[in-house]
């Protein structure tokens, strides 16, 4: 989860988020090099007294300032395209979970099993325990196994919402009348927190999401006890 004064991305807990962080670092390095180069050229033009009265056009200069940005864009575009394909890749999911956005709570359905569905509301501040997180904890958590491919189907019943778990690299719009899909896998057990990331009304800030990832044996026991 996010912490106080954290200006970086959250720790990655899925292979997809790990790749997104690699791409972020890669693109930031290229942006930094571009900033240094442009800053050096601008400062050189401002502070030196060199000039050329006879330089009206230069084929070489035009070739350089056309090819150099093109190469930089290619180095950014190729990893980006690979990530876009990974985001849409559906690789034989083990479990399908359906998330439905409402004003202002989420409801979930485990479509592979019978009669497993529930609503998930934020726990009010006056009902929190000492070890709970304000505006992030819910009364019913999503229970999912680790190291398993999960397919998430997302829709809404009223207005636009957005189902987001930053540490897993997931952000999918929940649109009324439309079913969106994504895939993810969690590397380690724990709690993963997220929130609705689309302004959806007065209580938009009070739509948290909590995933509890557990071992596959514990997940089977949970399914058996709730079926």
From Swiss-Prot:
Query: According to the record, how does the cofactor bind?
Result: Binds a dinuclear copper A center per subunit.
Which E.C. number(s) belong to this protein? 7.1.1.9
Keyword annotations of the record: Copper, Electron transport, Magnesium, Membrane, Metal-binding, Mitochondrion, Mitochondrion inner membrane, Respiratory chain, Translocase, Transmembrane, Transmembrane helix, Transport
Residue spans, topological domain Mitochondrial intermembrane: 1-26, 83-227
Q: Needs which cofactor?
A: Cu cation
Its record classes its membrane topology as:
Multi-pass membrane protein
Per the UniProt record, one Pfam family is COX2_TM
What family does this chain come from, according to its entry? Belongs to the cytochrome c oxidase subunit 2 family.
Its annotated function is as follows: Component of the cytochrome c oxidase, the last enzyme in the mitochondrial electron transport chain which drives oxidative phosphorylation. The respiratory chain contains 3 multisubunit complexes succinate dehydrogenase (complex II, CII), ubiquinol-cytochrome c oxidoreductase (cytochrome b-c1 complex, complex III, CIII) and cytochrome c oxidase (complex IV, CIV), that cooperate to transfer electrons derived from NADH and succinate to molecular oxygen, creating an electrochemical gradient over the inner membrane that drives transmembrane transport and the ATP synthase.
What SUPFAM superfamilies is this protein classified in? Cupredoxins, Cytochrome c oxidase subunit II-like, transmembrane region
Entry GO MF terms? copper ion binding; cytochrome-c oxidase activity
Gene3D superfamilies (alphabetical): 1.10.287.90, Cupredoxins - blue copper proteins
- List the source organism: Ctenocephalides felis
Record-linked InterPro entries: CcO_II, CcO_II-like_C, CcO_II_C, Copper_CuA, Cupredoxin, Cyt_c_oxidase_su2_TM_dom, Cyt_c_oxidase_su2_TM_sf
Q: Which reaction does it catalyse?
A: 4 Fe(II)-[cytochrome c] + O2 + 8 H(+)(in) = 4 Fe(III)-[cytochrome c] + 2 H2O + 4 H(+)(out)
Provide the assembly information.
Component of the cytochrome c oxidase (complex IV, CIV), a multisubunit enzyme composed of a catalytic core of 3 subunits and several supernumerary subunits. The complex exists as a monomer or a dimer and forms supercomplexes (SCs) in the inner mitochondrial membrane with ubiquinol-cytochrome c oxidoreductase (cytochrome b-c1 complex, complex III, CIII).
For the protein in the UniProt heading, the enzyme class is translocase
The protein's name is Cytochrome c oxidase subunit 2
Binding locations of Cu cation A2: 196, 198, 200, 204
Residues that bind Cu cation A1:
161, 196, 200, 207
Q: Which residues lie on this side of the membrane: Mitochondrial matrix?
A: 49-62
Segments spanning the bilayer are: 27-48, 63-82
Give me any GO biological process, just one: ATP synthesis coupled electron transport
> Cellular location of this protein?
Mitochondrion inner membrane
**Could you name the Gene Ontology cellular component terms for this entry?**
mitochondrial inner membrane
Q: Which domain of life is it from?
A: Eukaryota
Residue positions annotated to bind Mg(2+) are 198
């Amino acid at each position: 989860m996010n912490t106080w004064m954290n200006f970086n991305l959250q720790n990655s807990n899925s292979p997809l988020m790990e790749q997104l962080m690699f791409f972020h670092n890669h693109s930031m390095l290229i942006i930094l090099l571009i900033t240094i180069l442009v800053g050096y050229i601008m400062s050189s033009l401002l502070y030196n007294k060199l000039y050329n009265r006879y330089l009206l056009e230069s084929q070489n200069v035009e070739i350089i300032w056309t090819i150099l940005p093109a190469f930089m864009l290619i180095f950014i575009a190729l990893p980006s395209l690979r990530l876009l394909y990974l985001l849409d890749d559906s690789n034989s999911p083990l479990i399908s979970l359906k998330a439905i956005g409402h004003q202002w709570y989420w409801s979930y359905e485990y479509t592979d099993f019978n009669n497993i569905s529930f609503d998930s509301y934020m726990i009010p501040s006056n009902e929190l325990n000492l070890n709970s997180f304000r505006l992030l904890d819910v009364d019913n958590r999503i229970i999912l196994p680790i190291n398993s491919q999960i397919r998430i189907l997302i829709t809404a019943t009223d207005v636009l919402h957005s189902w987001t778990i930053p540490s897993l690299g997931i952000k999918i719009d929940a649109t009324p009348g439309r079913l969106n899909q994504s895939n993810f896998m969690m590397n380690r057990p724990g709690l993963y927190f997220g929130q609705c990331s689309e302004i959806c009304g007065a209580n938009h800030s009070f739509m948290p999401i909590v995933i509890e990832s557990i071992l596959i044996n514990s997940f089977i026991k949970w399914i058996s006890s709730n079926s």
